[in-house]
C-alpha cells in the first residue's frame, strides 16, 4: 500500500504538469492498485485540476477512484483529533489540512510510504517517530 498525496494525483491527471513524467515513472516501482488517498487530498487535487484544466483532468482522476485503482480512506474521529494536533504542532511549517490527513491516515493504516511531490514529508514524522519513505 502507498499513500498518495495531492501532487501526484494532479501530475498523473494533467500531462502538462511539471511532475507528470516523474510520477508516471514512479508508478512503475509499485502497484497502482495499492494507492490510498484521503478525502482532503482528493478534494484539493480536484480543485487544482479544475482550475488548471477543467473537467478532462478531473475525469481522469475520477477514473482512478471509480476503477478501484485508488482507494479513499475515510477518517475516524481519532484521526480528526490527530489532524488538529498535527496542524497545531507544525503551524510554523505550516502543515495544511490535506497533509495532516495523510499523516494521520499513515499512522492509522501503519504505512510509511507516501507518493508525494511535497518536501514537507521529509520534515513530518509519524507519531511513532518513524520517517516517511518518500516516492518519487
Which residue ranges define each predicted feature?
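Acidic, PIN/NYN-like endoribonuclease modules and their adjacent C-terminal/linker elements
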Residues: 1, 109-136
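Short, well-structured N-terminal submotif of metal-dependent ribonuclease cores
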Residues: 1-37, 50-61, 128-129
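Alpha-helix/helix-capping structural signal
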Residues: 7-8, 40, 78, 119-120
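Amphipathic alpha-helical segments within well-ordered protein domains
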Residues: 10, 43-46, 84
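Conserved beta-strand segments of alpha/beta enzyme cores
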Residues: 34, 71, 131-133
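Short glycine/serine- and small hydrophobic-enriched flexible loop segments
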Residues: 47-50, 107
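Active-site neighborhoods of divalent-metal-dependent phosphate/nucleic-acid chemistry enzymes
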Residues: 72-114, 119
Amino acid at each position: 500500500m502507498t499513500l498518495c498525496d495531492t501532487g501526484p494525483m494532479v501530475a498523473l491527471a494533467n500531462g502538462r504538469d511539471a511532475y507528470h513524467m516523474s510520477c508516471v515513472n514512479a508508478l512503475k516501482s509499485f502497484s497502482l492498485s495499492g494507492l490510498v488517498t484521503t478525502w482532503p487530498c482528493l478534494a484539493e487535487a480536484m480543485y487544482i485540476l479544475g482550475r488548471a484544466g477543467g473537467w478532462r483532468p478531473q475525469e481522469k482522476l475520477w477514473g482512478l477512484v471509480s476503477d478501484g485503482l485508488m482507494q479513499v480512506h475515510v477518517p475516524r474521529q481519532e484521526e480528526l483529533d490527530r489532524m488538529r494536533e498535527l496542524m497545531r504542532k507544525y503551524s510554523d511549517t505550516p502543515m495544511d489540512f490535506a497533509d495532516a490527513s495523510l499523516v494521520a491516515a499513515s499512522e492509522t493504516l501503519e504505512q510509511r510510504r507516501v507518493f508525494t511531490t511535497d518536501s514537507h514529508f521529509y520534515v513530518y514524522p509519524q507519531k511513532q517517530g518513524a520517517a516517511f519513505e518518500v516516492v518519487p
